[in-house]
C-alpha cells in the first residue's frame, strides 16, 4: 500500500487558490495525499485529473477515491505528455496544476524497485516499469566520461571521477547487478573522511542515476512549460522540488515567464507576445515548518514555488 507522507500538503494545495467548481491536475499522484486534500475542497462541478506512471499508485487511488466518481480521473502516463493527455480528455485549459517531484516513499521503500541504497536489490530505478532503460544499463554500459558527467551534474558529487573509475575497473571482470554492489564501489571511491559527513555516501550517485534513467530534468522542464500554457488566466501552478537542479529549473522558468524582456525604448505599447505570462506568488520558496520536519525527515530539502497566470 502507498503510505506516503505528503510534504507541504496545505501550503501546496491552498496555494492553488482552489475554486470549488474548477478543474485541477495533480501531475504526481503517488500516495494521493495532495489529491485527497484537493478533492475534499471541490463541489460536484469540480474535477481532478491525476497523473502517475506507476500502475500500483493508479490502482490504489482508484479504490481510495472511488466515491468521487467522474470527478476523479486517473491518467497512467509520464507528465511529459500533460497537454496531449488532457486534450485527449477534451480539456484545453485548467484552473491549477501541481507537481510534487519527490520519489514517493513506497517506491523508495520497495526493495525490488532498486531506488534505495539501504536495500540490496537489482539495479532498476525505473519510475515507469514499461520503460526500457534501467540503472543496470547506465552502470554497466555507459562510458567513464558519461558516468562522470551525470554524477557531477545530476548528483553534484565531488568524487565523481574516483567513483566512475571504481565502476569501470569492477565491470571489466563482472557486471554490477545489485544496488549493494554499487554502494560498495561508491564507498571505495570516496575518501574515508568524506564518507563520514553529509549523509549516506551513495545518496548523490543514486540520485544522479535515477535522474538519468528517467530523464527527469528534461521531462520536468518540458512539463512545466506545458503547465504554464494549460492554466487559465488567474489559475496557478504549484511546484515542490527536492534538490537544487529541479529548483533551479522551476525558479528560472517562473522568472523568465514573469518578467518583460528588454525592449527598444519608446515603444507606445508592449506587444502581447512580450507581456509576462506569470505573476510570482512566492518570491522566495516556502519551506517545511519545524513541526513538519520533526514528523517527516524526508521533507527537509523540499521547496515550494507558486506562480499565477496573468
From Swiss-Prot:
Pfam annotation, one family: Methyltransf_5
One term under GO cellular component: cytoplasm
This enzyme's EC code(s): 2.1.1.199
GO MF terms held by the record: rRNA (cytosine-N4-)-methyltransferase activity
Reaction(s) this enzyme catalyzes, per UniProt: cytidine(1402) in 16S rRNA + S-adenosyl-L-methionine = N(4)-methylcytidine(1402) in 16S rRNA + S-adenosyl-L-homocysteine + H(+)
Keywords: Cytoplasm, Methyltransferase, rRNA processing, S-adenosyl-L-methionine, Transferase
Amino-acid positions noted as binding S-adenosyl-L-methionine in the UniProt annotation, renumbered to this chain: 32-34, 52, 79, 100, 107
Top-level class of the enzyme under EC nomenclature: transferase
GO biological process: rRNA base methylation
Subcellular locations according to the entry: Cytoplasm
Recorded family membership: Belongs to the methyltransferase superfamily. RsmH family.
Function: Specifically methylates the N4 position of cytidine in position 1402 (C1402) of 16S rRNA.
Protein name: Ribosomal RNA small subunit methyltransferase H
Organism: Bacillus thuringiensis subsp. konkukian (strain 97-27)
Amino acid at each position: 500500500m502507498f503510505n506516503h507522507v505528503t510534504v507541504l500538503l496545505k501550503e501546496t494545495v491552498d496555494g492553488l487558490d482552489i475554486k470549488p467548481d474548477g478543474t485541477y491536475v495533480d501531475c504526481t499522484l503517488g500516495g494521493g495525499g495532495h489529491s485527497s486534500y484537493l478533492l475534499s475542497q471541490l463541489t460536484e462541478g469540480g474535477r481532478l485529473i491525476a497523473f502517475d506512471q506507476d500502475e500500483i499508485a493508479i490502482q490504489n487511488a482508484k479504490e481510495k477515491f472511488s466515491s468521487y466518481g467522474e470527478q476523479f480521473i486517473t491518467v497512467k502516463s509520464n507528465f511529459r505528455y500533460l497537454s496531449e493527455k488532457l486534450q485527449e480528455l477534451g480539456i484545453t485549459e485548467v484552473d491549477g496544476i501541481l507537481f510534487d517531484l519527490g520519489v514517493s516513499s513506497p517506491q523508495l521503500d520497495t526493495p525490488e524497485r532498486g531506488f534505495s541504497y539501504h536495500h540490496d536489490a537489482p539495479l532498476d530505478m525505473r519510475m515507469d516499469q514499461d520503460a526500457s532503460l534501467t540503472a543496470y544499463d547506465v552502470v554497466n554500459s555507459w562510458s567513464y566520461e558519461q558516468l562522470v558527467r551525470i554524477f557531477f551534474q545530476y548528483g553534484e558529487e565531488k568524487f565523481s571521477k574516483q567513483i566512475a573509475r571504481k565502476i569501470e575497473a569492477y565491470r571489466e571482470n563482472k557486471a554490477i547487478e545489485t544496488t549493494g554492489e554499487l554502494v560498495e564501489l561508491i564507498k571505495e571511491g570516496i575518501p574515508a573522511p568524506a564518507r563520514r559527513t553529509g549523509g549516506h555516501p551513495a545518496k548523490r550517485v543514486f540520485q544522479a542515476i535515477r535522474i538519468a534513467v528517467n530523464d527527469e530534468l528534461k521531462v520536468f522542464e518540458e512539463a512545466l512549460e506545458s503547465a504554464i500554457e494549460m492554466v487559465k488566466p488567474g489559475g496557478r501552478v504549484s511546484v515542490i522540488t527536492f534538490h537544487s537542479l529541479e529548483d533551479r529549473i522551476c525558479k528560472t522558468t517562473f522568472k523568465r515567464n514573469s518578467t518583460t524582456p528588454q525592449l527598444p525604448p519608446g515603444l507606445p505599447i508592449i506587444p502581447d507576445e512580450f507581456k509576462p505570462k506569470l505573476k510570482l506568488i512566492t518570491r522566495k520558496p516556502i519551506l517545511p515548518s519545524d513541526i513538519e520536519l520533526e514528523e517527516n525527515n524526508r521533507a527537509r530539502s523540499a521547496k515550494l514555488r507558486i506562480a499565477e497566470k496573468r
